[in-house]
Amino acid sequence: MSAVTNTLVHDLFRAIDSREFERLREICHPDVTYERPGYEAFSGIDRLLKFYREERVIASGDHLLTAALVDGAFGACWGRFVGKHRDGSDLDVEFADTYEIEDGRIRKRKSFFYRPAV
């Protein structure tokens, strides 16, 4: 297990939860791909940033990680997201992510939720 890449997963959620989306340029590979239920895959860092800034249905909240495991170029994490939808409703959702890591950055992320299209 690599402490550097484990930190990368935690850094990803800190940047997202604090809405410091520009930090994702340091954390994610320029050619990042992100797959999540309810959306077409996001390809490239600029497309990912557009999603977080303009399209995401989540207004605010925190990812509470139960665990993050990384082995070489692959990783996974799971936990719970607690926050607010843009419509004002409360969110409390279990999730799991898988990662592919290239050149010290997240190259591919795939999210799984225990409810439809969060």
Predicted regions and their residues:
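Short beta-edge strand/loop motif at the mouth of beta-sheet-based domains
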Residues: 41-50
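A beta-strand edge to alpha-helix "cap/lid" segment located at domain peripheries
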Residues: 3-4, 11, 15, 35, ...
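Short, low-complexity N-terminal intrinsically disordered segments enriched in polar/charged residues
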Residues: 1-26, 30
